[in-house]
Amino acid sequence: MGQALRKLTAADYPVVVQEPRKKVLAVKGLVKAYKSQHRVLDNINFELHAGEFVAIIGRSGAGKSTLLHILNGTIPTSAGEIINYHENGDTQNIAALTTKQMRKWRAKCGMIFQDFCLVPRLDVITNVLLGRLSYTSTLKSFFKLFSEQDQARAIELLQWLNMLPHALQRAENLSGGQMQRVAICRAMMQNPKILLADEPVASLDPKNTTRIMNTLQKISENDIAVIVNLHSVDLVKDYCTRVIGIAHGRIIFDGPPSMLNDSIIQDIYSDESAELLH
């Protein structure tokens, strides 16, 4: 007779322990107000971890784009801190950086836009190479020659997004989807740890929308934190791992897309939420 079967226990199965994702950024008490004293952003608090794919949603004028530009350093804060966590454990308040220090920060915090922001008359590969200049002064940028390493990186990125055949084509002759792929390549030239995307698919057709969202998802899967400003809740649920809902300058929801029900969506997009916040 064969050997009696032994009852399997938990000890027979390998235990897979997932390491907590690295914290890359913490926003604390962020406020943005203009001369009218109107607070576009009011007491914004959240943490960001490597590999997260975070959607920012809300009505037009809720402060979504302003938040992304503040994180990138192109708009100053009125109050609060933006803490950058370095690999060695050191921290740095982005909101207090000098102009020179801010250029170095932008090398680690790439950004793409709805209108692509390419130089129309330059060819594709030169537009991508311009991503290497974000950390240098404007004057030095005009006289800096791109290294062979820079050129190899640009070619690698263009090949990754199937844009290498268009490398010598002027940017103005590309389609919207192609322009956004070039913009992503440019943002990735510095190997950023954070990628900000301000309405990256707002002007694209469904096919190119899917392509760009798939690309952003792949980027996040490579331990890069991605924050995207989106209008489509369906895209948020299909692609993102986390949602931050902003209404009238304040965060009223922060959680996984699975918790984003009709009631919460209505609160985020309804004018009635203003009465609850003020």
UniProtKB/Swiss-Prot annotation:
InterPro entries: AAA+_ATPase, ABC_transporter-like_ATP-bd, ABC_transporter-like_CS, ABC_transpr_PhnC, MetN_ABC_transporter-like, P-loop_NTPase
Pfam families: ABC_tran
Gene: phnC
Self-association state and partner proteins as the record states: The complex is composed of two ATP-binding proteins (PhnC), two transmembrane proteins (PhnE) and a solute-binding protein (PhnD).
Protein name per its UniProtKB record: Phosphonates import ATP-binding protein PhnC
Highest taxon, organism lineage: Bacteria
One GO term describing the cellular component: plasma membrane
Residue stretches making up the ABC transporter domain: 25-273
Coiled-coil positions: none
Disulfide links within the chain: none
Membrane topology per record: Peripheral membrane protein
Binding site for ATP: 58-65
Reactions catalysed, as given in the entry: phosphonate(out) + ATP + H2O = phosphonate(in) + ADP + phosphate + H(+)
Keywords: ATP-binding, Cell inner membrane, Cell membrane, Membrane, Nucleotide-binding, Phosphonate transport, Translocase, Transport
GO molecular function: ABC-type phosphonate transporter activity; ATP binding; ATP hydrolysis activity
Family: Belongs to the ABC transporter superfamily. Phosphonates importer (TC 3.A.1.9.1) family.
PROSITE patterns: ABC_TRANSPORTER_1, ABC_TRANSPORTER_2, PHNC
Species for this entry: Yersinia pestis
Top-tier EC class: translocase
Job description of the protein: Part of the ABC transporter complex PhnCDE involved in phosphonates import. Responsible for energy coupling to the transport system.
Subcellular location: Cell inner membrane
The enzyme's E.C. designation: 7.3.2.2
